[in-house]
Amino acid sequence: FLPTAHGFDEFYGNLYHLNAEEEPELPDYPKSSDFPNFAKKFGPRGVLHTFADGRIEDTGPLTKKRMETIDDDIADRSVEYIKKQAAAGEPFFLWTNFTHMHMRTHTKPESLGQAGRWQSPYHDTMIDHDKNVGQVLDAIDAAGIADNTIVFYSTDNGPHMNSWPDAAMTPFRGEKDTGWEGAFRV
């Protein structure tokens, strides 16, 4: 099920939705004292770096703390990949999957408040997300390949109602997991 088993040369990221990555830190997660092998057998695998030759590097769990900065890591790795591929002069495909703005949003402490008074950590993290996207776009420009590059930016689904007013489904009806426009408008 790894992307590298389906045509990708390299993959760096997590294989689960973010809420699954948080589960081992929740108070009702099965305790290792009661279920010694539960986390190893059923828990999330964390952040993997995999390669088409079958190598798999486990870079560690995607904890709530790591979620604050994982997108910085993904942006840096994306930039390095762009530089490497552009220098080789070969066409390439890069699929960069940032974790923000997925619910739950974990904001790094130094970013709290950057959106200004009356704003939330969600807004602070949106600024960080914008910086990460900008970093990747700047790398394309710096590599001199912008005129021969297609960039497609999207999200996987609409917002959750419980993230209102930040979710921005208004004025559309519905939310994630419904058949209405608010679920699909991205």
Language model features with spans:
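Formylglycine-dependent
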Residues: 1-90, 98-109, 184
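Histidine-centered active-site microenvironments of extracellular/periplasmic hydrolases
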Residues: 2-6, 98, 103-109, 114-122, ...
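Stable alpha-helical elements in mature extracytoplasmic
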Residues: 4, 70, 74, 78, ...
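Sec-exported extracytoplasmic/periplasmic mature domains
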Residues: 13, 83-87, 134, 138-145
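Extended substrate-binding grooves/exosites of carbohydrate-active enzymes
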Residues: 14, 20, 118, 123-125, ...
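Short, mixed-charge, low-aromatic patches
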Residues: 29-38, 95, 165-174
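Conserved acidic
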Residues: 66, 70, 88, 118-125, ...
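Beta-strand elements within well-structured catalytic alpha/beta cores of enzymes
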Residues: 78, 92-97, 126, 133, ...
